[in-house]
Structure formats: C-alpha cells, structure tokens
C-alpha cells in the first residue's frame, strides 16, 4: 500500500521513525513518502523491499509560537501548497499526520475533500487550546490515535468515535534503548546535570543562557548539554560565548546523557517525559516571544494547569515549571537546589514518575497505531 506521512518536528521524527518500522513489519513492500528528519530517513536502510522517499526535512519546518510562524509565513504557505500538490500526484491509500497540528490540520481538510483516508497520530492538544477544532477533526479524520490516558475522557465526552488510545510511543523508544547494547554514556568524575534546551533555535536562544549561568556557579557538577546537529553546532558556539570548564555539549545522544544524569534542566516538550522515564529529577523551563505568550495566556492558560507532560498526566505538580518571567537565574538556582541536595524533594519527584509510568501502561504504541492505519487504509 501507499502511505504519506507528515512529521514537522524532532519529536514527530522520533515517533514517525518507530511508526514506519511498525508499518513495514506489517507491510514490507510499502510505498512511503514522508516529511520528517534523519530518524525517519534512516528506516529506509533496513527496508530493502520497501520504497521510501523523503519529501521535506524538518529543519525547514519547525517554527515555534504565533509570531515566529507569522515571520515565516511565506515559507509555511509555500510548504502547504507543495504538500497538497505532492499528495495529489502520489495518490496514497492513507495520509498519516504526526502531531504538528498548525500545518497538518490544514492538509487534513484538503485531503478529506479529495477523498483520501486520513489518520492523525498523536492528537493535537485541542483540549488545551482550540476545542472548536473538534468538529472539523471529526469531519476530516477517519482515525485519531491519541497517546495520553488523560485524553480519553475528552474524546468520549465530545463524541469522537474514531478516536483510539494506543499508548505512549516513548515507552517503546526508552525500552529499545535499555535493551540495546549500543550505549555511550557520559563519563565524569562529578555528578552529571543534563541540560536539555529544546529542539528549536528559538528555544535554545531563550533558555540556554540561564542554564549556563547556573553552571558557572556550581563547579561541583558536570553540566552537559543535549545538543542537536539539526539545529547546527555553530548556534551552540554562538550562545556559549565563554569557556566554562564544567560545561560540555554532546550531540544526538540524549538518552545516553539521561542514563548518566543525576538531575536535569529541561525545556518543556517531549523531553520532559523522556527525562521522567529515565527517572531523573528535573526542573522544566519555557520562554517564548512576549506577544506569543500573551496570546497563549488568553487561549490556553484558562484551560490547563500545567505545561509539562509529567504534570499533565499525573494532574499534579510533580515537577517545578518555570515559565516566561518565572524562568530566571534566581528561581532556577532555588529549584536546582531542591532537585540536587533536597533528598525528600527528589524522592517525591521519583514517586510521581512512578505514578505517571503506571498511568501510561505498557509498550506497543507504534505497533497498535500501524495496525489501525492499515485497517483504515483497507476501509475497515
């Protein structure tokens, strides 16, 4: 069968990679065109009988916040136009949307109007920001595979019969890492503090400076940045303007870093849950453009209490969230002490992680999603 997959961010690339593997295990001769990153493109190497083509790379797609999207509007609109044309030319049996809602929901409306079957993997967080989108999603999607147990109530209450809970794919990814032998953990004579400043250039520029300030005042720890070559090594060098003896950067090996870490400072996103699955106490941070933040407060803040996946899933403040103005050196220093020297605080966080892991259930999300996609592609 023919599959068209669209992922627009680093987390989507990770989940898309695992989904492609699962699809190929069920359909070894699949014909796949995709928007994604290096992880998704690497799947082709182990699939000699499949036909896999990358259309666009995520480095050209990941824009964060209302203002950033507007400033790249011509690029976004150009990508939408090209995507529509490419789908029509390819004529897939099913279109699979992986997160990335601002772009993907527009394409879903188009593909539905042209008679294609649509499956959305990793539900847009409409329960937090745009409940009005539930109606067009019901219309445009043949299947919606959501990954958070807390979303079940929302889709049940909003009469969305084609929504299915598949479990969280990060459980599969972390389990795969733990059972593999290809580990390259970070070596240090000091306790390692992981710095995860995000997967977008805008995030990196905003959150990394305070992390570096913290490191300069804590020479008793080794601070290691989870770098991404996708962003470009030059940008890290531009931000790290002085030589700090206890700061290093490792690239594209976040799990090796987390497996070696005593604590972490993490930019909000998928990485907060990954850090929790590795049971590393963390402080979560987030900063965006001021106007973007003001718009978000109007549309989102009144609907949700937390921004990190750990807190959202447990519906409690398991980990500290430092957002916008609260993310400054003084607050970070205070919360850093709690996750490093306060044994009771660390134990409370680890207990919260255990609750979250229990709520997520078991592994197998990618395989369940692939099975559902093939069923829908076959008209079942």
Place the predicted regions along the sequence by residue.
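Nucleotide-activated sugar donor-binding and catalytic core shared by glycosyltransferases
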Residues: 1-380
């Amino acid at each position: 069968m023919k599959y068209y997959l669209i992922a627009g961010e680093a987390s989507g690339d990770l989940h898309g990679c695992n989904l492609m593997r699962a699809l190929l295990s069920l359909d070894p001769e699949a014909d796949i065109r995709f928007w994604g990153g290096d992880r998704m493109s690497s799947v082709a190497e182990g699939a000699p009988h499949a036909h896999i083509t990358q259309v666009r790379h995520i480095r050209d797609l990941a824009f964060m916040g209302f203002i950033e999207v507007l400033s790249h509007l011509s690029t976004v609109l150009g990508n939408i136009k090209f995507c529509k044309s490419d789908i029509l030319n390819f004529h897939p049996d099913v279109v699979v949307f992986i997160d990335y809602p601002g772009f993907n929901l527009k394409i879903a409306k188009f593909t539905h109007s042209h008679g294609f079957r649509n499956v959305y993997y990793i539900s847009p967080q409409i329960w937090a920001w745009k409940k009005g989108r539930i109606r067009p999603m019901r219309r445009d999607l043949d299947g919606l595979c959501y990954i958070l147990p807390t979303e079940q109530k929302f889709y049940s209450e909003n009469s969305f019969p084609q929504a299915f809970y598949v479990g969280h794919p990060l459980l599969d990814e972390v389990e795969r890492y733990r059972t593999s032998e290809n580990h390259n953990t970070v070596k240090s004579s000091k306790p390692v503090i992981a710095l995860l400043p995000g997967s977008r250039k805008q995030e990196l520029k905003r959150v990394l400076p305070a992390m570096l300030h913290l490191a300069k005042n804590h020479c008793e720890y080794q601070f290691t940045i989870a770098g991404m070559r996708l962003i470009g090594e030059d940008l890290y060098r531009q931000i790290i303007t002085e030589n700090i003896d206890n700061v290093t950067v490792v690239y594209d090996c976040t799990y090796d870093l987390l497996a070696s870490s005593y604590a972490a400072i993490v930019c909000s996103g998928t990485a907060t849950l990954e850090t929790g699955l590795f049971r590393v106490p963390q402080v979560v941070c987030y900063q965006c453009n001021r106007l973007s933040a003001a718009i978000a407060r109007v549309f989102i803040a009144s609907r949700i209490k937390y921004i990190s996946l750990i807190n959202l899933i447990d519906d409690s403040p398991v980990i500290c969230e430092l957002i916008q103005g609260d993310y400054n050196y003084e607050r970070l220093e205070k919360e850093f002490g709690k996750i490093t020297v306060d044994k009771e605080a660390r134990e409370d966080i680890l207990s919260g992680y255990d609750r979250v892991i229990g709520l997520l259930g078991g592994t197998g999300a990618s395989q369940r999603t692939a099975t559902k996609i093939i069923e829908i592609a076959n008209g079942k």
